[in-house]
Amino acid sequence: MKTGKLVTLSVQNLVDCPVYRLYNMSTCTTGNYMHHAFEYVMANGIDTDQSYPYIDGDNYKCLYDKRTVGATISGYVNITTGDELEMQRAVATVGPVTVGIDATTDGFRFYKSGVYKDTKHECKGQYFDELHHAVTAVGYGTENGIHYWLLRNSYTTSGNCGEDCPLELFGQTFVTESVFEWEIRQ
């Protein structure tokens, strides 16, 4: 965020490359374990989506190329679970924050517009075991009195919210966050 440029990074890089073997992840379905991906990116960097685009399905043939690294991580910290002010400060002053969510509900999978509200969970910021998907909070706002996070999502744009998706602010959805610093290469 320091450069004012939003660089789209390669999801496929993390799906294909040894992040799962090296950092104890068995499949892509464990995507909510963001710290494993952070450790991999700290050690290797991550390619841009332009140089290593997403391919539907599991390829597992690593095509990582250190010459096309779009970002590295110098470190990351955990934000107190459920602390919405701490998360707002992190997004505003440091940069993107990753968030684990349950993306298995029909409401999320078929979301089209407006502020999405998870009606399945009543966690109110508490940890629960149904985190299946990682998204990145890049901003926040208010619409019709409802506070929300603006998220970057790796799902495709067909049938759901695609890359940018507003979700209700700690109403029921967000339970685990990490903030990290990117070094953006130009």
Question: Which residues are covered by each model-predicted region?
Answer:
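Catalytic-core signature of thiol
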Residues: 1-186
